């Protein structure tokens, strides 16, 4: 759908290429369809993916379908949002936070 930019869907198969090898900051929302609080974070992530298009990579990992990297990075509660730079975790937010918390995490790396 034109004009409707969605956050990138990241899978175990694409995680390394999309997240770890990115030359831009990457924000990853680990979520699941059954998770109520995830539905509060989702729209924020979608907005930020539009706002920071071209400057940062912003995506989502469905932990029910993609457990490898959730386990590797110790994601035990969702929503968990991790911020990566140069393949390393540089930020972590567990649970729901205000929009500015996520925006500032990206801004600080630009």
Language-model features, listed with the residues they occupy:
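Short, Lys/Arg-enriched N-terminal segments with co-localized hydrophobic residues
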Residues: 1-5
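A short beta-strand-turn-helix
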Residues: 8-26, 67
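Conserved Rossmann-like nucleotide-binding pocket used by diverse enzymes
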Residues: 11, 31, 57-59
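Short pre-active-site segment immediately N-terminal to redox-active cysteine/selenocysteine motifs
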Residues: 23-24, 30-34, 77
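Conserved helix-turn-beta segment immediately C-terminal to the redox Cys motif
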Residues: 23-25, 42-61
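Conserved redox-active cysteine motifs that mediate thiol-disulfide chemistry
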Residues: 30-44
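Structural microenvironment flanking redox-active thiols in thiol-disulfide oxidoreductases
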Residues: 63-69
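Non-catalytic, surface beta->alpha helical segment in thiol-disulfide oxidoreductase systems
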Residues: 83-110
């Amino acid at each position: 759908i034109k004009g409707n930019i969605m956050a990138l869907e990241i899978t175990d198969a694409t995680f390394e290429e999309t997240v770890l090898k990115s030359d831009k900051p990457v924000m990853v929302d680990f979520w699941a369809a059954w998770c109520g609080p995830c539905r509060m974070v989702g729209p924020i992530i979608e907005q930020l993916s539009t706002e920071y298009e071209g400057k940062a990579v912003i995506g989502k990992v469905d932990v029910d379908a993609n457990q490898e990297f959730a386990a590797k990075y110790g994601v035990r509660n969702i929503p968990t949002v991790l911020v990566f730079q140069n393949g390393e975790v540089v930020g972590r937010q567990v649970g729901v936070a205000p929009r500015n918390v996520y925006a500032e995490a990206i801004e600080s790396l630009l």
